[in-house]
């Protein structure tokens, strides 16, 4: 009941403000992935691995299988995030899905460079963008 109530509340907020609810799919069973994909709107955020968000040296989750199940159940775009920090990782994720999501790496640049961060972030984002073209 709690989940149903929360979902109903989210739908009311979505409808009131005209926004999409972005579904997150973590590594889980095919049935659960299919269920979430069928209800998805906007885009699907695929969580690349379980644990705390942040920079990872490698991602070992079978993301191809997750994307395959999503594609079998919806045409809503999906992007992979959670630990993506290098241009090589971004390219790999964009090759598998519709895009790569980067958050923590940008926050680290902001924390490290303060007022000078926009230049560093701009260069970083350009390198990521160039990698996925």
Where are these regions (language model features)?
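Glycine-rich phosphate-binding active-site loops on the catalytic face of alpha/beta enzymes
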Residues: 7, 48-54, 96-115
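Anionic-ligand binding region
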Residues: 14-44, 54-70
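Catalytic cores of alpha/beta
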Residues: 28-38, 80, 84-100
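Short, small-residue-enriched loops and turns at beta-alpha junctions
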Residues: 29-30, 51-57, 86-88, 108
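Generic structural signal for well-ordered alpha-helices
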Residues: 33, 64-68, 90, 122-129
């Amino acid at each position: 009941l709690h989940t149903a109530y929360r979902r109903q509340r989210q739908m009311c907020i979505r409808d009131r403000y005209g926004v999409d609810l972005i579904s997150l799919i973590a590594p889980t069973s095919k049935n659960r992935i299919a269920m979430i994909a069928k209800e998805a709107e906007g885009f699907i955020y695929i969580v690349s691995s379980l644990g705390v968000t942040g920079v990872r040296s490698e991602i070992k989750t079978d993301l191809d299988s997750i994307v395959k199940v999503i594609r079998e159940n919806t045409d809503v775009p999906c992007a992979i995030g959670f630990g993506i920090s290098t241009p090589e990782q971004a390219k790999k994720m964009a090759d598998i899905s519709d895009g790569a999501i980067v958050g923590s790496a940008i926050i680290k640049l902001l924390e490290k460079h303060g007022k000078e961060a926009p230049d560093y972030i701009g260069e970083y984002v350009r390198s990521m963008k160039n990698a996925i073209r």
